[in-house]
Structures are given as structure tokens and as C-alpha cells.
Swiss-Prot record:
The gene is ycf56. It comes from Pyropia yezoensis. Belongs to the AtsA family. This is Uncharacterized protein ycf56. One of its GO terms (molecular function) is 3'-tRNA processing endoribonuclease activity. The keyword Isomerase does not apply. GO terms for cellular component: chloroplast. InterPro entries: RibonucZ/Hydroxyglut_hydro.
Length: 263
């Protein structure tokens, strides 16, 4: 999986911060999972050379305009491009009513079905390779963060070596792949580790869409295989702009301190 970070940008003239937006491109397929849909998202996709037609799932962390500004426009663009495949949106419950109101007053109809899923604590998407977990970032569960878990990959069984040792095909192949050991009648010792490659461990990818420091943010970063890079601003700069939506150097050091303490 490749994570594309649509980076934070501070607009000094308007004294405003654009929230972080992510796109996850799956390795096995050409699918793209979009996390949040900020304003001007179509232009961002064009600059990043990603194809918006490959979007199959959209995860919205909150109903604020900062998270959903580009969603109606993106869906309309997909309609104009002739999309027919369904798209799944994982969001708070009120987002469905918002989109229904947008289509009503703009007199727009989408050419593809939209499947809405209400966000709640726990696994939202579970497939053969990945699991997306949703975590509430506020007490009233109005804002959510996401964790992507890549499942471990079992080692490949070395069939050629088994045939070289004249091991008959059967249930013993499965046991050897599970790295069980056997002692043959002629005294030959079979080690399961010699018949399969090592298991590739899974990965944890944290997508802290709300970058304000909190305990849950530290837990999201705990044991992350690939922590997502976030812009770190000086504490004075963060206070000047918007302190509850920017990651300052003090907050970042606090997160690392929490993780080192738990480990």
C-alpha cells in the first residue's frame, strides 16, 4: 500500500490551515481509498497524477466543512466522467443528509450508487489484505481517526525441496508450511523452517487526521510500522495560526515520550 499525503499548508494571508488529506493506493489492485475530501480535491488529484476514477472508498473523519468541502464536487466529477461502479462512504450519520440536501438544491443526480456506512469504534473495512479501524477522537464521537492494518503474509512453501526428498504430497505439506517438525521412520529429521520462507509481518499505519495532541493520538502512533509524516510547526507559529489543528514541536515530543514510556 502506498500512502499519498496531501500536505498541510498554512495560508498566512487568511490565517487559515488546510487539514491533512490522505489517499491510500492499494498494491494488489488499482483501488484508491480516500481519507477526507478537502476543497479543490479534483485539482489535487490532477497534480498528483492519481486517477479519481479508481476511488472505491471514502473515509470522512467529521462533518465539518473542512473535511467535506470537496465531496459534492468530487462525486459530481465522477458522474460527468461516466462512472457506473458503486462507491462506499464511511462517515458520521449526518453526512448522508448533507449530501441529499446538496443533490436536492443543486438538482444533481449521481450516475452510480453510493453506499453509506456509519462510523463507529472498531473495524470498518476488513478484506483479504487490509483492515481499517476507526477510533473516536472526541468524547462526543464527532471526530474520528483511522488506522490501517496490513495483515501478515504467510511464507511460501518450497515444493521443489519437498519433491527432492521424496515427500509424498498430502497433509504433511501443510504441516511443514506451518513449520512443524517431523522425524521420518528412517531417522531423517525434517525441520519445517527449511521448507517455507519466513512469514512477512504485518504493518500498522496511523492516519491521525486530527493532529492536536491527545492520549488517543499517542496510542494511534504506538508500534506504527510507518508513521505518517506530518508538518511540525514551532509552538509560537501554531498558536498564531490555529492551535487545535496544527502539530507543534512540543506536541510531537510529547507523543514520542508517551510511546517510549509505554514500550
Amino acid at each position: 500500500m502506498k500512502i499519498i499525503l496531501f500536505d498541510n499548508k498554512i495560508n498566512s494571508r487568511l490565517n487559515k490551515i488546510t487539514l491533512t488529506n490522505y489517499a491510500a493506493k492499494l498494491d494488489q489492485t488499482s483501488e484508491i481509498w480516500l481519507f477526507n475530501c478537502i476543497e479543490n480535491i479534483q485539482h489535487i488529484f490532477f497534480k498528483s497524477q492519481l486517477k479519481s476514477s479508481h476511488i472505491t472508498k471514502i473515509f470522512i473523519s467529521g462533518t465539518s466543512f473542512e473535511y467535506t468541502a470537496g465531496l459534492p464536487g468530487l462525486l459530481s466529477s465522477l458522474t460527468l466522467s461516466g462512472r457506473l461502479h458503486p462507491i462506499s462512504i464511511y462517515s458520521p450519520q449526518s453526512l448522508k443528509k448533507y449530501l441529499e440536501a446538496c443533490t436536492k438544491y443543486s438538482q444533481t443526480n449521481f450516475s452510480f450508487p453510493i453506499n453509506f456506512h456509519n462510523l463507529q469504534y472498531g473495524g470498518q473495512v476488513v478484506n483479504q489484505f487490509y483492515t481499517v479501524i476507526c477510533l473516536p477522537l472526541s468524547k462526543k464521537s464527532l471526530l474520528y481517526g483511522f488506522i490501517i492494518l496490513k495483515k501478515e503474509k504467510q511464507g511460501v512453501f518450497n515444493l521443489a525441496q519437498a519433491k527432492t526428498l521424496n515427500i509424498l504430497q498430502g497433509p504433511i505439506y501443510g504441516k511443514l508450511k506451518e513449520k512443524d517438525n517431523f522425524l521420518s521412520p528412517d531417522g531423517y529429521y525434517l525441520s519445517g523452517q527449511d521448507f517455507s520462507s519466513n512469514t512477512i509481518m504485518g504493518h500498522k499505519i496511523s492516519l491521525p487526521l486530527l493532529v492536536r495532541y491527545s492520549r488517543i493520538i499517542s496510542e494511534m502512533h504506538w508500534f506504527c510500522s510507518y508513521p505518517i509524516r506530518l508538518n511540525t510547526y514551532s509552538h509560537q507559529q501554531g498558536v498564531k495560526c490555529l492551535p487545535h489543528n496544527v502539530l507543534t514541536d512540543i506536541m510531537k515530543s510529547q507523543i514520542y515520550q508517551d510511546n517510549s514510556f509505554v514500550e
